[in-house]
From Swiss-Prot:
Species assigned in the record: Homo sapiens
Pfam family, one: DEAD
Keyword presence, rRNA-binding: no
Mutation effect (residue 192 to S): In NEDHSS; uncertain significance
Name of the protein in question: Eukaryotic initiation factor 4A-II
Gene: EIF4A2
Assembly and binders: eIF4F is a multi-subunit complex, the composition of which varies with external and internal environmental conditions. It is composed of at least EIF4A, EIF4E and EIF4G1/EIFFG3. Interacts with EIF4E. May interact with NOM1. (Microbial infection) Interacts with herpes simplex virus 1/HHV-1 protein Vhs.
Listed EC numbers: 3.6.4.13
Motif range (Q motif): 33-61
Positions in coiled-coil regions: none
Positions contributing to ATP binding: 77-84
A GO term for molecular function: helicase activity
Keyword terms of this UniProt record: ATP-binding, Disease variant, Helicase, Host-virus interaction, Hydrolase, Initiation factor, Intellectual disability, Nucleotide-binding, Phosphoprotein, Protein biosynthesis, RNA-binding
Length: 407
């Protein structure tokens, strides 16, 4: 295809290395599959592991290194691939922490995404003392100005309109900004932010490093890459298609965190009809729940990133062979557990980000396997569950009494 696409692009004005159907061809093959081998600052590594990451995702294995090396990078990736942490880690690695000036700018299409990015940056940069301000419409402009004037945050993340406004009024100084990230570029352009994005580019240093992330590559995105990026590294990460079709999703209103354990014990008989995976949000909690279940004489296995690979392999083998029936684990292994016979998943904790929901309970579409997912929901979780329903355009119903018949 590559020869043809080059001819097509010459005639139609697209950049080299693009398919006419808007899929980029990767031109970077270096893969680093371990955070420890990326030469990151010690304080940043601590933040990465404390956040719960164990192994870099496909995009992180490919894109962090060229970003850190200062290349312009175009990454074609959907949400749920770990793209936010990719550029968050790259920015944090390049920060000069002692220097109290804004050194990186991130644009996102919506306030919600901007705030989500800010959260990830602050969490990963926690041990470094990195500061990050979210510049978003719908908040008080005067407060924003005072904040930006009082102390320049290391990183500003925001929506194009508000960021342009702050640059224009000179409350946000472009002088020391060395890295500019456009997240969900296709979304931003389809929402009509093109002029503001171009105007922001005009205000930034011409030597700035540009990192652009986009799920699709329509012409208006390609135009940005041609106009503002120099010899970009191109990275394409295909997302596995996961589906919730055929999965019956239920919730149990446990009301309070401390009532989850009894609820789980009541369900144990049901779990062992088949094989079940129970997801929790932290490794510490996995250990805690495993101990509690053992103390009550329930047989369960646990799996998380603190264990060495040998130990994990043994546990996975036992689980795959069916000799262990209930597995307690964290999100990071959600992507790695493809156990054909798991037909029941319990979210003891709802996932902290909604993309992980489909990684926990979704199935590869081509197998079309049936399954049941049960979500433990406290009062505080109700909003998160609604958010998940909206995001996936799905419904999660209250668990019926005869759930055993459905498994």
């Amino acid at each position: 295809m590559s020869g043809g696409s080059a001819d097509y692009n010459r005639e139609h004005g697209g950049p080299e290395g693009m398919d006419p159907d808007g899929v980029i061809e990767s031109n970077w093959n270096e893969i680093v599959d371990n955070f420890d081998d990326m030469n990151l600052k010690e304080s940043l590594l601590r933040g990465i592991y404390a956040y719960g990451f164990e192994k870099p995702s496909a995009i992180q294995q490919r894109a962090i290194i060229p970003c850190i090396k200062g290349y312009d990078v175009i990454a074609q990736a959907q949400s749920g691939t770990g793209k936010t942490a990719t550029f968050a880690i790259s920015i944090l690695q390049q920060l000069e922490i002692e220097f109290k000036e804004t050194q990186a700018l991130v644009l996102a299409p919506t306030r919600e995404l901007a705030q989500q990015i800010q959260k990830v940056i602050l969490a990963l940069g926690d041990y470094m003392g990195a500061t990050c301000h979210a510049c978003i419409g719908g908040t008080n402009v005067r407060n924003e100005m005072q904040k930006l004037q009082a102390e320049a945050p290391h990183i500003v993340v925001g929506t194009p309109g508000r960021v342009f406004d702050m640059l224009n009024r000179r409350y946000l100084s472009p002088k020391w900004i060395k890295m500019f990230v456009l997240d969900e570029a296709d979304e931003m352009l389809s929402r009509g932010f093109k002029d503001q994005i171009y105007e922001i580019f005009q205000k930034l240093n011409t030597s700035i490093q540009v990192v652009l992330l986009s799920a699709t590559m329509p012409t208006d995105v390609l135009e940005v890459t041609k106009k503002f990026m120099r010899d970009p590294i191109r990275i394409l990460v295909k997302k596995e298609e996961l589906t919730l079709e055929g999965i019956k999703q239920f919730y149990i209103n446990v009301e309070r965190e401390e009532w989850k354990l009894d609820t789980l014990c009541d369900l144990y008989e049901t779990l062992t009809i088949t094989q079940a995976v129970i997801f929790l949000n932290t490794r510490r909690k996995v250990d805690w729940l495993t101990e509690k279940m053992h103390a009550r004489d329930f047989t369960v296995s646990a799996l998380h990133g603190d264990m060495d690979q040998k130990e994990r392999d043994v546990i996975m083998r036992e689980f795959r062979s069916g000799s262990s029936r209930v597995l307690i684990t964290t999100d990071l292994l959600a992507r790695g557990i493809d156990v054909q016979q798991v037909s029941l998943v319990i979210n003891y904790d709802l996932p902290t980000n909604r993309e992980n929901y489909i990684h926990r309970i979704g199935r590869g579409g081509r197998f079309g396997r049936k399954g049941v997912a049960i979500n433990f929901v406290t009062e505080e979780d109700k909003r998160i569950l609604r958010d998940i329903e909206t995001f996936y355009n799905t419904t999660v119903e209250e668990m019926p009494m005869n759930v055993a018949d459905l498994i």
